[in-house]
Every structure is written in structure tokens, then in C-alpha cells.
């Protein structure tokens, strides 16, 4: 008696003994319970997410203003806007107790060294919002005594346009900063410094909403929006 040995291929079609198609049946309820009660990932990601959640919801702003945009910024601390909803209402009188600075107004060259010194005294990690056209690019003051943008000597995280920006615009910039902080990956120790820090790329809002603005047909005044 002779035998022929052949290798079995489970995926190959078998004309003599046809097999039905294989389908994987999943239990959605079981999968939901597994993902709800069992974490499948790195513990480092959980710890980083918890730290970023605490950082973005407990920003300590430094009470510092330069010009008329500062009036609009302080308006955001009043009851109609209630910046306390975002955990950033505790204004600090000393830069050593703050981790968040808003450059609101015109930055003159004489003020630049003072602002930089205050920034260096702030706690790590720290963030900066440039509020208003003058802080962003010098505004209408294209003269020798005005710095043409605070990003010439400070790292800026969020730019808020306007002359001056409304309090709602400042709150939107604060929310964008919180979103960016939530995606950061940085060492958990403040002693390490800026090395090994990953910040998510933040595209301009005018680019993200370009199609939405073009599609608008009914124009309304700012008071009606």
C-alpha cells in the first residue's frame, strides 16, 4: 500500500471536501466590558494623562499686563465670562508661584528684559499666551521702540488675534492651550528642563475654519452672534 503525504493549507479551497467560510463572531457587550474594566497599554501613558489633566485644569496665571488688551483679559475673570470654569482664576502675585503668563498689550523694548526675567522666574512647566495684535506682531506700532512680536524673545504657545481681542477670544485661546497641554509628553520632573518635550502641532484656526467661513451666507454683527 502506498501513501502520498501532502501539506495541508487551511486557506486553500478544497473541492472534494468543501468547507464553509470562516467568520469571527464578536460579542460587543463583552468587548465593551473588557475595555471598560481592563486597561491594555502602558502605565506610563496613564500617568502622563493624569498629570496633563491636572496641569491643564489648574493653570496659575501671573497678574501682568502691558496695555489696553489687559483690560479685556481681566474682563474674562468677571462673572459673565467666569474663567474659573477652566481652573485658571487663581491669579498669582509672584512669578515664582505661577506657570502661565499672558502677554496682553504693547511690548516696548524697555519692557522686554523685565518680561524675560519674569518668565525665567516662573515655575516649570510654563506656558505663554500672546494676546492682541501688538503682542503678536507689534500691531500698528511699526517703530523703533516697540518689539515686533513677543516671540522674538519668548516661546509663545498660543496667539490670540484682535485689537483688542474680546474676552471670548481669550477664553478660546485658553481652551486651545489646555488642549495642547493635554497632548504634551514631557518628563515628570521639573528639574530636567526642556529636554525630551513633545508638543502637539497646533494649526491656525483660520486655516481650520476656512471652508466654514466661506460657506457663510448670512452675515451678522458681533452682538448678534
UniProtKB/Swiss-Prot annotation:
Subunit relationships: NDH-1 is composed of 13 different subunits. Subunits NuoB, CD, E, F, and G constitute the peripheral sector of the complex.
Protein's recorded name: NADH-quinone oxidoreductase subunit B
Note on cofactor: Binds 1 [4Fe-4S] cluster.
Function recorded in the entry: NDH-1 shuttles electrons from NADH, via FMN and iron-sulfur (Fe-S) centers, to quinones in the respiratory chain. The immediate electron acceptor for the enzyme in this species is believed to be ubiquinone. Couples the redox reaction to proton translocation (for every two electrons transferred, four hydrogen ions are translocated across the cytoplasmic membrane), and thus conserves the redox energy in a proton gradient.
Enzyme class, spelled out: translocase
Catalytic reactions on record: a quinone + NADH + 5 H(+)(in) = a quinol + NAD(+) + 4 H(+)(out)
Entry's family note: Belongs to the complex I 20 kDa subunit family.
Alphabetized NCBIfam families for the sequence: nuoB_fam (TIGR01957), PRK06411.1 (NF005012)
Cellular component, GO, one term: plasma membrane
InterPro entries xrefs: NADH_UbQ_OxRdtase-like_20kDa, NADH_UQ_OxRdtase_20Kd_su
Chief location: membrane
Localization (cell): Cell inner membrane
HAMAP family: NDH1_NuoB (MF_01356)
Origin organism lineage: Bacteria, Pseudomonadati, Pseudomonadota, Gammaproteobacteria, Pseudomonadales
GO biological process: aerobic respiration; electron transport coupled proton transport
Binding-site residues, [4Fe-4S] cluster: 68-69, 134, 163
Lineage top rank: taxon: Bacteria
Amino acid at each position: 500500500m502506498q501513501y502520498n503525504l501532502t501539506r495541508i493549507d487551511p486557506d486553500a479551497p478544497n473541492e472534494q471536501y468543501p468547507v464553509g467560510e470562516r467568520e469571527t463572531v464578536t460579542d460587543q457587550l463583552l468587548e465593551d466590558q473588557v475595555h471598560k474594566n481592563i486597561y491594555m497599554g502602558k502605565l506610563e501613558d496613564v500617568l502622563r494623562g493624569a498629570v496633563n489633566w491636572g496641569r491643564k485644569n489648574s493653570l496659575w496665571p501671573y497678574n501682568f499686563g502691558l496695555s489696553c488688551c489687559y483690560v479685556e483679559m481681566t474682563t474674562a475673570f468677571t462673572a459673565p465670562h467666569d474663567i474659573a470654569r477652566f481652573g485658571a482664576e487663581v491669579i498669582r502675585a509672584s512669578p515664582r508661584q505661577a506657570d502661565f503668563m499672558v502677554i496682553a498689550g504693547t511690548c516696548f523694548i524697555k519692557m522686554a528684559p523685565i518680561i524675560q526675567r519674569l518668565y525665567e522666574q516662573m515655575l516649570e512647566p510654563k506656558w505663554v499666551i500672546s494676546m492682541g495684535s501688538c503682542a503678536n506682531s507689534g500691531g500698528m506700532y511699526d517703530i523703533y521702540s516697540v518689539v515686533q512680536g513677543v516671540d522674538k524673545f519668548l516661546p509663545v504657545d498660543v496667539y490670540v488675534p484682535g485689537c483688542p481681542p474680546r474676552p471670548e477670544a481669550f477664553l478660546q485661546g485658553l481652551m486651545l492651550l489646555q488642549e495642547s497641554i493635554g497632548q504634551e509628553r514631557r518628563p515628570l520632573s521639573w528639574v530636567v528642563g526642556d529636554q525630551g518635550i513633545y508638543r502637539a502641532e497646533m494649526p491656525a484656526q483660520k486655516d481650520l475654519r476656512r471652508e466654514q467661513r466661506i460657506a457663510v451666507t448670512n452675515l451678522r454683527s458681533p452682538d448678534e452672534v
